[in-house]
Amino acid sequence: MEESEYESVLCVKPEVHVYRIPPRATNRGYRASEWQLDQPSWSGRLRITAKGKVAYIKLEDRTSGELFAQAPVDQFPGTAVESVTDSSRYFVIRIEDGNGRRAFIGLGFGDRGDAFDFNVALQDHFKWVKQQCEFAKQAQNPDEGPKLDLGFKDGQTIKINIANMRKKEGAAGTPRARPTSAGGLSLLPPPPGGKSSTVIPPSGEQLSVGGSLVQPAVVSGSGGATELWPQSKPAAAATADIWGDFTKSTGSPSSQSQPGTGWVQF
């Protein structure tokens, strides 16, 4: 045993009883009813300690702490600690002295909760010992450990709901951008009402497009409303500005340039 290993305390119970047990003649388990339970051979304190992989059951005096007996346990359950067949409060432990002599004695608890704690403390210790052994084996042989299998088994299928994915993508989509004109200006939507608004020039005035005077055309079925756009030749209108320069019928086009805002000024 290494010198660097330290001793830890796993469980302490203030009162336990020790009994002399008759030798077992057959392979059947021990029975506490065969002991003299009303006349224990010794009573005192119990401590379970651990040093490395070995646990030690120590029976000590309540007042002075003097060691009465000690039972080293290297495996649980095993021959070092056995439960009786007729009660959960009594056990048979194998004690040893420093000279290698061994003896089996009966160990009893006055409360079932103390007996439960005694049993669980030993179970937890040897569960930890088992884990440490597995970790040591994996460290020595890392390739021998279980490998993660992410493949599909025979007949295994999965389901993907594409409809829900499309709904989520549509809800999280960005709004469409407004169409822009050739000059980079955003086009405003048409006014509500279903009828396009018309602008009628004052009486006696004419519109000039590209230096030519034109008369406003009357659209059939419009109730006499005049159309804003002049009925000029497409070739001549294409050479002018996209909206055209509108001037009054004074005889000469306006020399003042109009701002290219896209709106008709009168």
Curated annotation (Swiss-Prot):
Modified residues (Phosphoserine): 181
GO BP terms, alphabetized: endocytosis; protein transport
Main localization of the protein described in the UniProt heading: membrane
Keyword Cell membrane: yes
Keywords, alphabetical: Cell membrane, Cytoplasmic vesicle, Endocytosis, Membrane, Phosphoprotein, Protein transport, Repeat, Transport
GO cellular component labels: clathrin vesicle coat; plasma membrane
CDD domains: PHear_NECAP
Tissue specificity of this protein: Expressed in brain, heart, kidney, liver, lung, skeletal muscles and testis (at protein level).
Database matches in InterPro entries: NECAP_PHear (IPR012466), PH-like_dom_sf (IPR011993)
Motif WXXF motif 1 per UniProt: ranges: 243-246
Region described as Disordered: 165-198, 245-266
Source organism superkingdom: Eukaryota
Keyword Protein transport among record annotations: yes
Bias-annotated ranges (Low complexity): 249-266
Segments carrying motif WXXF motif 2: 263-266
Compartments it resides in: Cytoplasmic vesicle, Clathrin-coated vesicle membrane; Cell membrane
Similarity field: Belongs to the NECAP family.
Role played: Involved in endocytosis.
Domain-level remarks: The WXXF motifs mediate binding of accessory proteins to the ear-domain of AP-1, GGAs and AP-2 through hydrophobic interactions. Selective binding to the GAE domains of AP-1 or to the alpha-ear domain of AP-2 is tuned by the acidic context surrounding the motif and the properties of the second residue of the motif itself.
Subunit structure as annotated in this protein's UniProt entry: Interacts with AP1G1 and AP2A1 components of the adapter protein complexes AP-1 and AP-2. Interacts with the GAE domain proteins GGA1, GGA2 and GGA3.
Full protein name: Adaptin ear-binding coat-associated protein 2
Record lineage: Eukaryota, Metazoa, Chordata, Craniata, Vertebrata
